[in-house]
Amino acid sequence: MIRAFREEDAAAVAELLRGALETPWVVTEADIVHWERSPERARRATWVAMDGLAIIGWAFAQLRWEVSEERVGEVWGAVAREQRGRGVGAALFDAVDQHLASIEAAKVQSWAEFDPGKRFLVARGFREVRTERISSVDPRSTDPPGLDTPEGFRLVPLRDALDRAREIFAVYMAGEADAPDVFEVDNISYEEWELETLGAPSLDRDGSFVVLHGERPVSIALLEVDREHKRATNEMTATLPDFRRRGLARLAKAASLRWAAELGVTSVLTSNDRENPGMLALNDQLGYRPLVVRGLYVRGPAGPD
């Protein structure tokens, strides 16, 4: 049975996703609830697939509210490993497709990391348009370089820079502007970012770091952490254009890895477009190793503009 997601489903959905995902992304009960608080213009809808009282699948569909191009939809879902091949994913996608039609999405983006998911999307009219390298590091097994702070700069945990949140937002959006993507991420207000990113339950204010020039944030390494399951995800690493090529991103990201190692985190995941050589090289220097190539897929008459 397919039904609408309810907030009380969050713990079971988080457990489902941790088991269904082949790569250890950060997914907590609080995150699942937080994802439902997208801006109203996203017109988000979420479903679960039930087998008796057990949740065996989950999917969402919405408009990409953070891009200025209109009528761009976004979908993704997962099915418990032991339940695959029974039509659960297809049933969820039927609900997704009906919602996409109701919100008049002209183009739809999704992604998949492994061949079964990629075949599922292709069979439903999607085509691969970009690829990302998913990489991982066990922070306990690496000794990242780059901890010498250049003169005039200061490294602090995010918690100690929250009074400069609007300036951190400017650094974040500079990173978004330069990161290759299917659709340009250019339609986020500070208030939306404050709720969606800074307010994310897993964004660790001790494990994320900010580089200050004087008192001005100029580089960031944001880290999402699941302390219970000892896993972490790099949310954003970025530097203002005028301060690049000084090792500041490496400084901040290395600090987050050292912090994660001290916490006992066993895996830090990151994703980078394969046409982003600078960030790929930085991650290689810090000890990240490739896990899988994620395909980014689009369904629609013309693809991204």
Q: What does each model-identified segment do?
A:
Residues 1-35, 148-188, 192:
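Short amphipathic alpha-helix that is part of the acyltransferase structural core
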Residues 7-8, 17-109, 113, 213, ...:
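Conserved donor-binding loop and adjoining core beta-sheet/short helix segment
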Residues 65-67, 81-160, 294-299:
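Acyl-donor-binding surface of acyltransferase catalytic domains
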Residues 223-224, 231-234, 245, 249-255, ...:
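Extended hydrophobic/aromatic segments used for targeting, binding, or gating
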Residues 85-98, 239, 245-258, 277, ...:
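Conserved acetyl-CoA-binding loop-helix of GNAT-fold acetyltransferases
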Residues 17, 93-94, 110, 172, ...:
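Polar/charged side chains located within well-ordered beta-strands of beta-rich proteins
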Residues 37-41, 199-204:
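Short loop/turn motifs at secondary-structure junctions and domain boundaries
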Residues 124-143, 207, 258, 263-305:
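Active-site/acyl-donor-binding loops of N-acyltransferases
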